[in-house]
Structures are given as structure tokens and as C-alpha cells.
UniProtKB/Swiss-Prot annotation:
SMART domains: ARF, RAB, RAS, SAR
Binding-site residues for GTP, renumbered to this chain: 21-26, 40-43, 62-66, 121-124
Places the protein is found: Late endosome membrane; Lysosome membrane; Cytoplasm, Cytoskeleton, Spindle
Keywords, in A-Z order: Cell cycle, Cell division, Chromosome partition, Cytoplasm, Cytoskeleton, Endosome, GTP-binding, Lysosome, Membrane, Mitosis, Nucleotide-binding
GO MF annotation, one: GTPase activity
NCBIfam families xrefs: small_GTP (TIGR00231)
Entries under InterPro entries matching the protein: Arl8a/8b (IPR044154), P-loop_NTPase (IPR027417), Small_GTP-bd (IPR005225), Small_GTPase_ARF/SAR (IPR006689)
Xref: PROSITE patterns: ARF (PS51417)
Family recorded in the similarity comment: Belongs to the small GTPase superfamily. Arf family.
An example Gene Ontology CC term for this record: late endosome membrane
Record's protein name: ADP-ribosylation factor-like protein 8d
Oligomer and partners: Interacts with tubulin.
Gene: ARL8D
Length: 176
């Protein structure tokens, strides 16, 4: 009889927040199924989905982005492995609102120290901001109470989604 190595899965719990139409639900679906769909309906309240990538079990909380749901973001961001803030990098008209909502969320004492991953989504759209411009517009350099990372993705581009999931898996393994 040979002993199998203990390949106990690592676990990650992520809350995906951001303004409505930033691509949170599309992102969850692409990470879970590998397929993108144009036919998304706005999330009412929240949805939760579990996926496993490279022996890492990831629980994704997809939170509604409409103004009436933003008051619940903080509650679902407590005690998670990471807050994932999704921004439509092509929607420059709403960046100031997105920045304000992000900084309001991060000002909650219950969330101090929880790592932040900002995802600039929809980079396939002409006029989408660069990583540097998004970092500046979102005021990420002023966020000092936690680890902060910014990645640029398109839910329509499997390569960027693979890079994101690789980053999440590696981040999970480096923390455990």
C-alpha cells in the first residue's frame, strides 16, 4: 500500500463588488464555465458560486452593483480572503462614482487588512483605460491599509481570464 500525498485543497473566498454593468456576473460565469455570454441579467442581491482551480476551492460572492445593493457590500466583504472590485475600464463617465464607492467600502473598520484586487474589465473596448490610468483614476496609491493589486481583463478574452485565475491560485498558495 502506498500513501498518497496530502493534496488538501486550499480555499479562497472572494467578494466581487463594483458598479452595475461592470462585468461581475460575466466574470463569475467565465471563471466557472470558460464561456462568455452577452445575455446577462443584473444581479439582484447576490449569487454565490464555487469553482475549483488547480486544487484551490474558490467561493465567489457576486454582489449586485445597483445603488440599492451597495449598502450590503461591506457585510459580504467581512472575513473574505480578498475583495475583488470590478471596474468597467471603458466607462469613464462613471469612474468617479466607482472610485467613491470603492473608497467608502474600504473605509469600513471591519474590512481593514483584507487584500484588494481591482480588475479593470472590458479592455477589449476601444477607449478603455490603461492599467496606469485606472490605478490613478481609482486612487489606488492612497490605499495603504491593505495589499492592493490591479489587473486588466476582458471577460471575452480567455487569455486574460486564465492569467487572472493563475494569479488567484498563486496568491492563494502563497498565503496558505
Amino acid at each position: 500500500m502506498t500513501l498518497q500525498p496530502n493534496l488538501q485543497a486550499k480555499e479562497m473566498e472572494l467578494s466581487l463588488v463594483g458598479l452595475q454593468n461592470s462585468g461581475k456576473t460575466s466574470l463569475v460565469n467565465v471563471v466557472a464555465t470558460g464561456e462568455y455570454s452577452e445575455d446577462m441579467i443584473p444581479t439582484v442581491g447576490f449569487n454565490m458560486r464555487k469553482v475549483t482551480k488547480e486544487n484551490v476551492a474558490i467561493r465567489l460572492w457576486d454582489l449586485g452593483g445597483q445603488p440599492r445593493f451597495r449598502c450590503m457590500w461591506e457585510r459580504y466583504c467581512r472575513a473574505v480572503s480578498m475583495i475583488v472590485y470590478v471596474v468597467d475600464a471603458a466607462d469613464t463617465e462613471n469612474l468617479s462614482v466607482s472610485r467613491s464607492e470603492l473608497h467608502d467600502l474600504l473605509s469600513n473598520a471591519s474590512l481593514i487588512g483584507i487584500p484588494l484586487l481591482v480588475l479593470g474589465n472590458k479592455i477589449d473596448i476601444h477607449g478603455a483605460l490603461s492599467k496606469e490610468a485606472l490605478t490613478e483614476e481609482m486612487g489606488l496609491s492612497s490605499v495603504t491599509s491593505r495589499e492592493v493589486c490591479c489587473l486588466m481583463i476582458s471577460c471575452k478574452n480567455p487569455t486574460t481570464i486564465d492569467q487572472l485565475t493563475d494569479w488567484l491560485v498563486n496568491h492563494s498558495k502563497s498565503k496558505n
